[in-house]
Amino acid sequence: MKRSTGGTQPKGLNVKRSKLADARFIEVESPALSNGAVDLKKFIESRSFEITALQDAMKRSKESSAQRAFQALPRCLRRRAASHNIKRIPKGLRDRALYEMQLSSSSTLPIAPSRQRLKRFIKRLRRKLAKSGETKAIDSTGSLVTDNSTDDSRIPSLAAVKLIRGKFAGRQLRKVWLPTHLWVCKRAHMINAWGYAIPEKPTEKSYRPTHRAAFRKDAIAFDMSYEPLFCISGPYEALKEKFGNSFANGLPPVFLNSSRSFTSYLVKSDIHELICPCFLQWNNPTEDDKKQIPVKNPTECVQLVIRLHPSAFLQAWNYLSGIAVLDDRIAMHDWRLDLASFDIHGPDSNIMLHKVFDDVELDEAGKVWQSISNYSSACLPMGASISVKALVNTRCDKNLSEKGEKSLLDSAENSLPASANQYSTHFRYWERQEIPSFAVFENKNRHTHEKKSSEKEVIPVYITYRKEWNGLTVILPWDYAKFVWRKMMYQKGIRFGGLENLHQIAFEKRMPFFPIDYPDTISGQLCEEERKKRNEDSWKRRPPAKRVNYQKFGDNFSEIGNPFCCDWVYLNEMVKASRDEDKTLQLVRVQVQLVQRGSLQDRARIYCLSDDELSKWKTIIYKENLTAENLLYPKCPNETAIIGFVTTGNFNLNAGKPSGIANVLAKTIKNEKSGYCIIRNVGCSVPRLAQWKFNQSH
């Protein structure tokens, strides 16, 4: 029923516009001139009237706005469900929100303090304190099953979960909270994976903002503390001899004698099985740390620091420890839950990180760190690593926008290099021929760091540039990570992301994302099983009339293999049934991109093309310019032509067209670096011509 309008109020879309125009109308008076002469009395009255009219128009314009205080907030701070609670609004807008609540006709009133409520709270608190003294501490949290633990702690056994005491200890018995959990869990969707509570994606819309932060301007930060850190200690010659074949590119000495990190693939050299990609860094421990390493001749030891994906950690640890246990010169150290790590991606990641670590000790590394404060991330040398001692505020109630106490920096020494010669001089820091030493890998406990005051402590921080991500990786002690993260999130121009956002950035950079795009690994197979179950459950929850019938769609077309996953089992059986001599399922990761318009989705089927079929497709596309509805549009090849699946497919905002990461049979592409194929989405009978490209760097 329409709402009746009283009087002769105009109808249409211009009602609101006319009201706003009337509210902003300012009345004026005549110049008060008589025969060219100024009448002083009338002139003052006219100007007084105009000033009053201006003030009245400003007031009416302000009151005519339909925007409330909570609506004036940026999207990331809006709490529409709790807009009646002024405590959910920043302090600068609370007075305005309280005033609007009092003027409104609703019965919502600000909550008045209650003495009875306070008494009940104190009583409950006393009961909890009395009960906490009677509870027993948790003695053990179990251990992971490892194959090669030794009694002399050279190869230690692994703890399943870090021992936690406190208010939320019961929630962390079967999973580990990241150091930023209390901040992130209010702002992101959380998932339990690989024994950790990990943010999946922010609660606000983040697909396009993630693209802008990672590729256009600003930066995006990820808490990567769930990726385990551990190291292998021993003489370099022993490590190169035992583990040289376990990494795809070996252990070249060029990275040993320079402050640079590098990435590689961990493989089982005896059976040529890929385990996972990994991040590597050489470290020269101090003499005191060398004495504590339980190996023969500890003074000759160097450390190979490794960071990899948590889904492959146990497999990698068992494989590497199986090699290390045979040589008493080699030891392994588990640094999980002792060291936290952040990844900051984007063109301004270096500038943002300098705003966080703006107060460092001015040793040689500290001066180099300050000299590159205004450089873009792309200007840094590939794999450049540096260790600084930063002053961290450990008080959460301080205003992080203020400088606080006097900085450790001298303003004269904190200036940027004035010439290109000074620029190159500072960058020679990463060309020195010596084994680097990083303090963060030595003192990992919180109470061993120097205290400058009751609020600030000096902690070691490791920072390295990752060229493939165009960002920086930060490693720091676990207990200080929450303070650094909080300061980082209060910087203008930086946002946080979750697992889905990290996958999106890798996809737009056309990089395979582990473990989703690695079906030839054990972790990738387990991940595909989880995705299959999730897709099938989502399909079953939909009503029959609203879900795709994979048994019959299009022109009597039925889906090939399991429609809820990339069915590698089906492809493997098809390879075994073929007449080829090589009946092994060897996969190669390639990039795919549609030639024409269309959509590209996960689990899409890839078909090979003969030369005759390719010429027919090119004739139709480039000459006749026909659409998919045309009768001359080629039909989809039969099931024997399937050569792979698209593991990640979507619209690529960086490329401006649909693209994807796919895995195809190695024998079908031979030695070619690019070619054409046919791609068909799951539940769709229309094929699309696509171009694949082999990327050797990934």
Swiss-Prot record:
One GO term of the biological process aspect: tRNA processing
EC number: 3.1.26.5
Annotated Pfam families: POP1_C, POP1_N, POPLD
Swiss-Prot/TrEMBL catalytic activity: Endonucleolytic cleavage of RNA, removing 5'-extranucleotides from tRNA precursor
Keywords: Hydrolase, Nucleus, rRNA processing, tRNA processing
Major localization class: nucleus
Disulfide pattern: none
Top EC category: hydrolase
InterPro entries for the chain: Pop1 (IPR039182), POP1_C (IPR055079), Pop1_N (IPR009723), POPLD_dom (IPR012590)
Compartment(s): Nucleus, Nucleolus
Domain of life: Eukaryota
GO cellular component, as recorded: nucleolar ribonuclease P complex; nucleolus; nucleus; ribonuclease MRP complex; ribonuclease P complex
Its biological purpose: Required for processing of 5.8S rRNA (short form) at site A3 and for 5' and 3' processing of pre-tRNA.
Record's subunit section: Component of nuclear RNase P and RNase MRP complexes.
Family named by the database record: Belongs to the POP1 family.
Full protein name: Ribonucleases P/MRP protein subunit pop1
Organism annotation: Schizosaccharomyces pombe (strain 972 / ATCC 24843) (Fission yeast)
